[in-house]
Amino acid sequence: MTITITDRAFERIYELIELEKDKNLVLRVSVDSGGCSGLMYNYELVSKDNIEKDDYVFTRHNATIIIDSISQKFMLNCTLDFIEELGSSYFNVSNPQAKAKCGCGNSFSV
């Protein structure tokens, strides 16, 4: 699977895990139906015990990201980054497969 995950994204995941004080956590990124355009990215800290055999697993900077097999096809050639702007911070997926985004930027279609 080809996906780029920036150092900033891994560093932020590590910070979130440190805040939870549970080294057994990983970030699950998934694509689910929802939003104005039909598909949305979801981010959830879950236990390493929840890693499935067909999950794609990325580990760097003492942080792990997992993507389920269904979501993988929607995330091919994507870049996952963590953005800090004036007054807000968020994970951002740049997806070359996205044909449209909703006005608020929270959902997309392929």
Curated annotation (Swiss-Prot):
GO biological process: iron-sulfur cluster assembly
Pfam families associated with the record: Fe-S_biosyn
InterPro entries: FeS_biogenesis (IPR000361), FeS_cluster_insertion (IPR016092), FeS_cluster_insertion_CS (IPR017870), HesB-like_dom_sf (IPR035903)
Molecular function per GO: 2 iron, 2 sulfur cluster binding; 4 iron, 4 sulfur cluster binding; iron ion binding
Domain of life: Bacteria
NCBIfam families, A to Z: iron-sulfur cluster assembly accessory protein (TIGR00049)
Family from the record: Belongs to the HesB/IscA family.
Protein name: Uncharacterized protein RP063
Organism for this UniProt entry: Rickettsia prowazekii (strain Madrid E)
Source taxonomy: Bacteria, Pseudomonadati, Pseudomonadota, Alphaproteobacteria, Rickettsiales
